[in-house]
Each structure stands twice: as C-alpha cells, then as structure tokens.
Amino acid sequence: MRIRGVKPFASAVGLLLGLLYAVDAAKVNKHKPWIETTYHGIVTENDDKVLLDPPLIALDKDAPLRYAGEICGFRIHGQNVPFEAVVLDKSTGEGVIRAKDKLDCELQKEHTFTIQAYDCGEGPDGGNMKKSHKATVHIQVNDVNEYSPVFKEKSYKATVIEGKKYDSIMKVEAVDADCSFQFSQICSYEIVTPDVPFTIDKDGNIKNTEKLNYGKERMYKLTVTAYDCGKNRASEDVLVKINIKPTCKPSWQGFNKRIEYEPGTGSLALFPSMHLETCEEPITSIQASIMLETNHIGKGCDRDTYSEKSLHKLCGASSGTVELLPAPSNSANWTVGLPTDNGHDSDQVFEFNGTQAIKVPEGVVSTTLKEPFTISVWMRHGPGGREKETILCNSDKTEMNRHHYSLYVHNCRLVLLLRQEPTESESYKPAEFHWKLDQVCDKEWHHYVLNIEFPAVTLFVDGGTFEPFLVTEDYPLHTSKIETQLTIGACWQGGSARMTQFFRGNLAGLMIRSGKLENKKVIDCLYTCKEGLDVQLPEEVASAVKVEFNPNQSSLSLEGDDIESFEKVMQHISYLNSRQFPTPGIRHLRVSTTVKCFNEETCISVPDSEGYVMVLQPEEPKISLSGIDHFARGAAEFESVEGVTLFPELRIVSTITREVEVEAEAETEAEGEDDPTVQETVVSEEIMHNLDTCEVTVVGEDLNGDHESLEVDLAQIQQRALEMSSSNVGMVITGVNTMANYEQVLHLIRYRNWHTEALFDRKFKLVCSELNGRYISNEFKVEVNVIHTANPMDHANNAMVQPQFISQVQHASVDLSGHNLVNTHQASVVPSAATIVIVVCVSFLVFMIILGVFRIRAAHQRTMRDQENGKENEMDWDDSALTITVNPMETYEDQHSSEEEGDEEEEESEDGEEEDDITSAESDSSEDEAGEQEDQQGSSRQQQLEWDDSTLTY
C-alpha cells in the first residue's frame, strides 16, 4: 500500500540535507596559510640554489584537510626579481627559492623582494583559496673569484737621478672586477724580471735597492704582475720603464723649445708646466728675465703694416701730416727707383746704400715750414764713417749750397740743422741740435720723433724723451729769392748741381707735419707693438713676486724668494699677438735666471733656457669684388651733371678657407658596430676686416681732362675719414676703414664725359687691398657702353602719322644690369658703330615694306567698297599727302625682344625674305599705341586695323 505524500516529504528532507551540507562545506577552509615575516638567503653567483634562514615552510591550521590544509604555491612580488619559489611538499608546506638564471655579483650583490603562500582552496579547482601575509626576503649573492687583476695603465714610466736611493720611485696599481672584498683586493705585486736593482711592496711602490749608475745603465725595463687575495694572477703583466738621469744639474724643467702660436687665438701660455730643478739646494731668492726677440720682425716687432699716414690717423693724429716716403703709386711716384725690403707680410721699408737719393716734388711740403712742426721717421743704421749721412735735407735749388733745414747722422749722433729765415735782427740763434745716442748705430729699428717749437726741440726715441747734449748757434740766412729743393737720402748742392752726404741704412715712415706738435699719446701709439709678453698674476702669489715690463713688453723681469710662487708666475707668462693677420715666423725666447743660497760657496748656477715662438701663417683672406661688370647708358647720362655710376651694385666680401676635422660614424657591414673616423673637410668662412686702399684705373687711354673725369662726393669721403686722390689714370681712395664703408664710397664714384660723339665704350678696373698691399682683391673690370640716339628726320611729319601705322622698333637695352640682366657675361648687348648702321638699314627697310603693304591694302579696300554698293566703309584713307617718318634709332623696350628681333632682322638680310616678316609683335605695338590714343580721346571702343593679306601679291 503506497502512502500518499511520502515522495514530497522525501524531497523536502533531501533539500534540507543539501543545504546543511553546503553550509558545512563553506566552513571547511577557515584559515590562511602562515609563513615567517623575514627570510635571509645566500646564493653563490653562477649557481641557482638559495640557502634560506629560516627554511621556507608554510603552515595552515586547516590541515590535515585535503585542499584546505595543503599549500599549493608561493608567489613572489617585485619587479624584475630573478628568483622563483617552488613547493616541494603540499602537505608539509615545504618550499625552496631558486634563481631563474645565473646571477652576477658584479652587477648586483643583494636582492630584496616579498613572498606570499597560498593554499589549495576547497577543492581541485582551487576555489576559495586563501593567501598568507607577505614576508620579506633578503638574498645575498656570494662572489666567485672569476676575474683577474688588471693594471690601470698599459705601461709606466719614471725618471730617477743616478747616485740616489729613493723611498718610492713610482707606484703601479691594479684593480680586480670581483665584487667581494676578498677577491677584489690586490694582495701582492711582484717584479717578474730577474736580477734588477728594484723591489716592489704590496701597495705597488717601486724603489731601488742600490744606487743607480747612469754610465752602467740608462734605462731599466721591468715586468710587474699582481695577485688578488684569491691568488689569481693579473691577466696581463705591465711594462715599467725607469730612466736614469745623470747627476742633478740645476735648470728649468718642462721647457718646450718650440711653441706654436696660431693667429687669432689670444694669449698663449709659454711655460705651462715649467718648474725649477734646484737639486735640493736651499734657495733664499731668485731672479729671472724673459726676453722675446722680435727685432727681425718688421721694424722691431709686429705692428700694423698700414701706410705711415694711415697709422697716424689710427693713432689720433690731426690732419696735415705729409708722407715723404710713400709706397710707389700713380699719385706718388717719386719713390719708384728706391730699393725696398718688403715681403708684404711686414712694413715697406726703403734701403739706401750710399749712392741713392730722391727729390721730393714741389708742392708736397711747403717751402718754409710753419712753426711748430714735427718730423718723425723709422731708422735702422749701423756704425758709420766720419762723413755726414743725410736723412732729410732742404737746400738751395740753384746757385748756392745753403742748407735751410736738415736731419742727418754723424758719428753715432743725430743732428737737426734748423737755420732761421732772414729777419730784421742779425743776432745768433740756435741752429744745430746734437744728440749722442747708442740707438743711432746699433743696427736696430728705432722710432724717432722731433717736436720743434723754436727754440725748443724735443726728441722722442722709441717713446722716450732725450735732451740734446749740444746746441750750436748761427746767424739767420740772408735774403734770397732762390727756390729750395727737398731731398731724402742725401743733400742737394745747388751750386754744383749734385748730391752729397749720402745715407747708408734703412728708412721708413718719414713724415712732416707743420703747424702742430705731435702729442705723447700719439707717439706711444705709433711705437706700441702688437705682440709681446703678458702675465696674469694669480691672486695668491701676486704679492710674493715682483714683475716689471719694458716699454714694448718684449721682456719682463721677475723677483721673489718663494720658489713655488715663482714657478706659478712663470707658468702664467704668455705670448700675445693682437693683430688679425700677424707676421709669421720665429720669435726667439730666452730665460735667464740667477739664484741666491744660504751657502754662497755651494750655491747653484742655473743656465739660460732658450726656445722660440713660431707664429704660424695666418689664413689668407680672399677679397672678392663682384657686381655689374657690363652695362650701357644713353649719351645724355654721361653728359649730365650726375654722370654714370660705375659700381652701383658692388659687393666686397672677404673669405678664408680652412681645413676642419669632422667625425663621421660609419657602420661596418660585418659587425654592425660604429666605426668613428676623422675626415678633413675644407670650409669657406666669411670674415670681416678693414681695407686701406681701393684704386680705380682706366683701362686703355688715359682720361682727357678737357671732356671727361671720375668724380665722387668728397663730403661722403671725409665723413668716413677717407682720402681721395685722382689723376688722368684713375682715382685712389685711401684710409683704414671697414669694407662696408669702402663699399658705400665706391657706389658713389661717377664717370662723366661731356663730349660723347666719338665715344662708344669705356673700361675701368677696380682693385682693393688691405695692410698696405699684403692682401689684394681680384681685378674687377667694368665696361660701360654709350648709346647714341639719332636725330629725327622730320618732326612735323612724324607728328602727323597715326600711331597705328608706325612700326615700333623696340627699345635697345638701356641698362643691361640689375633685373634686366640675367647673365652679365652671356646675355650682354654691346652697341657699336656696326650695330647702329645695321639697325638703321633694317629699320628703313621695314618702313618701306610697311608703306608698300599699306598702299596695297588701301587699294584693296577701295575695290571692296565699290563692290558692296553703299556699304559703310571701315576706313577711308587719303594718302596723297601721307608722310611717315620713323626714328631708326628708337630703343628696344627690353633686352629679350631686342635679341629676338635682332635675330629675325639678320635672317631677313641673309635670306632676302623681308616681305614675309611683318611680325605680330609689330602689329601688337601698333594696336597698343592706337588704344592709347583712343583712351585719351575718351572713346569706349578700340579701333584696330585688320589686315587681310590673303590676296596680297608681291
């Protein structure tokens, strides 16, 4: 018998039991695993096993339940941790930490990270897994002695003096790359070479075991090795060279005999590593003098090599200075015959050998000098004979031999003769001033300046003043109308018409300035060298050493009692050349030293040290002149007051070319590594410097002053402190100034010609230079052509012609420059007499063709009008009185059209096909003129002459 309701009851009971079982199961994994809070481990590099303290064991209170009480794994936290944790036994929770890859102690000695244990959850799927807290793990990597010692240097050198035993000659040092203290330390060094008188300690100090003998051995070569504390020997032994010097000799050490100076680099230290070897002798004081010998450079040293007149201006001298020994030029040619000693790197000087003399032209210096006045000159003169040697002399030109004023040398004395002009009083007055000077006969260059303000005369020699030791008196000169002659290098004897008292030596920069004395500042500036010695005293030794210079800084003297401070000052002595383009060559250098000791008997003697400064050749600037070199202008422009500008777009550019080293990285195809190589590249660099002369010269016939000239605005010249001189061969602009200022002045030079009938072209040449001709530009040649315009044949008839029927001859190129000139060499048009004749003939021929065509066209129009019976005519022409006059010399509108039409006209002349060449350009030109006329009349419709030449016969 089945009981109803049992089945539903059983289901309810089963559901209840399932819920109870689920709740029970949810409480199975109740606890988290547990591990220690900190672990310390050790691992040896190149091994993966880590020894942990304490061991890695995770515990779970849910044990021994399966899953919930088991440890399934460990998880490591941290970035780039080179370790992993592995479970060895799930039930016991035992695990290990091991390295993923081989470790390197040299890269990292210690590693720190965190670790966490997790159980297996409540079943195989790991559900409801629990994690322990995070524990910190510190692992130290133990070193392996895998590296050998390596010496810091590839080789070692030392120098010792014979006969001495040293505590330490030198020290060698090796390093080991191992990371541990034990294996990275060098425990010992060893000299491998047998039977040598040297030993080495554990710190690498080498010393000699006996006194060394220079005669026995001048150099020892030792092989040294090293051992680390793990007994590893150095991978490579090192070579040690010990030089033996003879017994100590006091001298300056670290002195380079050759010192190269590159222009433009400022000051150069001469003795940067210099020190005094005293051989351990106690020194109480020391003195030294440093001499820079520059007497062979220029006039005693390196100075700017501009003309003496330019140098006076640069030094601030006022105007009125006259240069009596200028460089030969078109405007100053009286020095042409004199031998010169100029290499363009230095000043231009004139040589007098006792047979040459020159006469200064009249007008260069006034006959009677206004007082006060100044005479200045550079002179080099050796011991002479008993004869007087005249530098400058102003004497009677004819009849008599009176010397009005004279500067001469006699028995190593410099003498100024100054005779007074006739006066009412006949009393004695000072006439001769004598100076006895060593400089007059020492064969060296010296600068002499005489400031004369009668009766006082002041002499400056190399910037220093000298008083005359003797002054003699004489009567004033007698009244005479005889003219005087100014000579240089001898004195003119007017009575016998010959030269006498010839000079033997060298002169340069002979100047006279009347009306004003030269001030001391200008004199010092003229004499000051652009090169010399310099010293920047360190503050700590400035008071310990006394330093003195001579006036031109070619020598200095030092004095002190502390050797260390003295050496520091010596190391700061430098050579300086402030010129942009210095004179290259050798400057000898000498250091002379004296010392004082406590014991004078055994005091040392320091020999002189000698060397030289080699001033290298400066990069030579290339001065380039460029611009429009060919153009044409109408004759009217040449005849106008303004004239024609010769250099409207002139550009002056200076460049230097130098070699520079460039590092280039080239990848090797085989290894793919960078292979840096050094390449030399030539680069051109624009620089700025001054110019001192620009000369415009006529190419061809000289200028005819009756009808042509070169002109420039003198106010603009003076505003830029320049000077201009002109002659029939051209124009010279002088003065030290910037390239930009010279450019502006050259833009203003104009050529005028007020009789151009027979002139068709003129050619000019421009050359600029720097440093008195040391650097010269290219020759910039300019050709200007004259465009002649023919006179109209009949102005009245020409005015009557309608513009539609005037065939325009397009404008010949008036200006082949600027925008119209594409290439001044390839596309220039040069009108000439032959060209003008051709244009006239062709224009007349074209005119006849147009006239013939016009008449044929008119006849054809009348025929058509008769056939159309009353039709309104387009045009009605009455040519019975028609006269057309065309100016055959009408200029072309542009150069391009001129060239095209010129080619067409040549083809017409050659082929005889003139009738077929009525071009559309000519028709267009007629139409354009017609349109202009109608615009002026206010017409809204443009009338054009349309030709139908389909029925024309020729």
From Swiss-Prot:
Transmembrane segments: 834-854
Subunit structure as annotated in this protein's UniProt entry: Homooligomer and heterooligomer; mediates both homophilic and heterophilc interactions with clstn2 and clstn3 paralogs via cadherin domains.
Biased composition (Acidic residues): 900-935
Subcellular localization(s) per the UniProt record: Postsynaptic cell membrane; Endoplasmic reticulum membrane; Golgi apparatus membrane; Cell projection, Neuron projection
Span of the signal peptide: 1-25
Family that this chain belongs to: Belongs to the calsyntenin family.
Gene3D superfamilies in UniProt: 2.60.120.200, Cadherins
Region of interest (Disordered), ranges: 891-954
Topology Cytoplasmic: residue spans: 855-954
Tissues where the protein occurs: By 48 hours post-fertilization (hpf), widely expressed in the brain, with strong expression in the telencephalon and the midbrain.
Membrane topology summary: Single-pass type I membrane protein
Function, as annotated: Postsynaptic adhesion molecule involved in vesicle trafficking; required for branching of peripheral but not central axons of sensory neurons. Promotes synapse development by acting as a cell adhesion molecule at the postsynaptic membrane, which associates with presynaptic neurexins.
GO MF term (any one): calcium ion binding
The organism's taxonomic lineage, starting at the top: Eukaryota, Metazoa, Chordata, Craniata, Vertebrata
Extracellular side: 26-833
GO cellular component: axon; cell surface; endoplasmic reticulum membrane; Golgi membrane; postsynaptic membrane
Biological process, per Gene Ontology: axon arborization; axonal transport; endocytic recycling; establishment or maintenance of microtubule cytoskeleton polarity; homophilic cell adhesion via plasma membrane adhesion molecules; positive regulation of synapse assembly; positive regulation of synaptic transmission; regulation of collateral sprouting
Coiled coil start-end: none
SMART domains associated with the record: CA
Keywords: Calcium, Cell adhesion, Cell membrane, Cell projection, Endoplasmic reticulum, Glycoprotein, Golgi apparatus, Membrane, Postsynaptic cell membrane, Repeat, Signal, Synapse, Transmembrane, Transmembrane helix
Name of the molecule in the record: Calsyntenin-1
Domain Cadherin: 35-151, 152-252
InterPro entries to which the protein is assigned, alphabetical: Cadherin-like_dom (IPR002126), Cadherin-like_sf (IPR015919), CLSTN_C (IPR045588), ConA-like_dom_sf (IPR013320)
